[in-house]
Structure formats: C-alpha cells, structure tokens
C-alpha cells in the first residue's frame, strides 16, 4: 500500500433496498427492525454486556455483535436467538470488528490496547497485535493482507498479516486520539478521523 504525504515512520455500509436495519444499543438484546414499517421482526439474545459494534459477514449469513470483552456470532438465517459462536480473549470493551472478504477470519480492536485476528470457522485466535494505548477502530485493507488501526494516543498503525509486523506508524496530530479509520476501496487513500475541541478533523495521511 502506498502511503501519501504525512508524518509517519516506516518499520456500516447499507445494501441498496435493505429491508432490515440493526441499531447499536447500550443494552442487550439486539433487534432486527423492518425499515419501512418500524416493526421489530426478530430479537437476538446478548445478555453479557452492551453492544458496541455490529458487522454482517459478506455473504450475509452471520452477524457479529461486539460487546465488553467478547464477540458473539449469530446465524441470521436461523431462528435460533442465541449465538452460534463466542470469541473470547479481550479484557476490555471491543471497539471495532470487520470480516475478511470471504468471511474466513475476523479482526477486532479493543480498549485493552490490542488488535486480534480470529478464525471464524474454529473460533481460535490467530494474531495478536499490541498498541501502546486503547484502540478505537480497525479496518481491513482491500488487499486483505493488511490491517489499519487507530488508537487514543493519536497513532495509526498498518499491520502486515503475512509478516505479522507493523509496517507503518502514522501520527496525524500529536496526542489527539484517532476515533475512526477508513481506506478507499482501491487502497489508494487512507483517512483518519479525530475529535479536537469541537467537530471532527479528517486528515489525508
């Protein structure tokens, strides 16, 4: 991935015509709502904690609900209201979740200062990357071989999954927490968003 100009050191998109919407909630459970009628069509049990982030697999089969210390995976096409798999390993709130393009693995970020990669078939932990501060967000690069994460210390890190190392460390603004990261679909542009005084500042890195 080419990193544009900036300070660095080198080593819910909705589907068109969507009929259901899933809100984030500070209390369990998760609910499916019919977007046009406003009727709650289904409820999923999430008893352990609040729900921080939601993500649907690319094949629209599963829903991941990230809570306090774990992620629960639900079968969307099943009538079972309980999770079919639970991913345990974080020690604080989970702040980000994303799926590989074929749903083979999942990545999570957490206030415990780590980014973790999970095998969605076995539920096992495959990678563990450490920040020096709470991590607010993580995304997968379109090449599926890199992760980009942002933390409360104001650092954006690029992780190479093949080599299992941090290849770039970027600092949009010193000591200003990075709340959100996003990468263009062709991988040509990486953006980070922070909150400084009032409003959000987005910077091209």
Regions found by a protein language model. Give the residues of each.
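Per-blade loop-tip surfaces of WD-repeat and WD-like beta-propellers in eukaryotic adaptors/scaffolds
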Residues: 3-9, 32-49, 68-92, 117-135, ...
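Hydrophobic packing within well-folded, soluble alpha/beta domains
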Residues: 30, 54, 94-97, 106, ...
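C-terminal closing repeat unit and adjoining cap/tail of repeat-based domains
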Residues: 188-189, 205
């Amino acid at each position: 991935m080419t990193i544009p100009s900036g300070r660095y050191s080198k080593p819910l998109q909705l589907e068109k015509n969507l009929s259901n919407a899933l809100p984030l909630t500070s209390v369990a459970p998760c609910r499916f709502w019919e977007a046009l009628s406003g009727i709650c069509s289904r409820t999923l049990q999430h008893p352990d904690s609040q729900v921080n982030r939601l993500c649907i697999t690319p094949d629209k089969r599963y829903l991941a609900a990230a809570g306090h210390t774990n992620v629960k995976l639900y079968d969307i096409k099943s009538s079972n209201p309980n999770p079919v798999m639970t991913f345990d390993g974080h020690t604080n709130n989970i702040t980000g979740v994303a799926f590989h393009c074929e749903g083979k693995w999942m990545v999570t970020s957490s206030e415990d200062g780590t980014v973790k990669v999970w095998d969605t078939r076995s539920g096992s932990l495959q990678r563990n990357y450490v920040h020096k501060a709470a991590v607010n967000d993580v995304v997968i690069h379109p090449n599926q071989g890199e992760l980009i994460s942002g933390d409360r210390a104001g650092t954006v890190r690029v992780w190479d999954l093949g080599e299992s190392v941090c290849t770039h460390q970027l600092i949009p603004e010193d000591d200003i927490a990075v709340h959100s990261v996003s990468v263009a679909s062709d991988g040509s542009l990486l953006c980070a968003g922070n909150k400084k005084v009032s409003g959000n500042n987005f910077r091209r890195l």
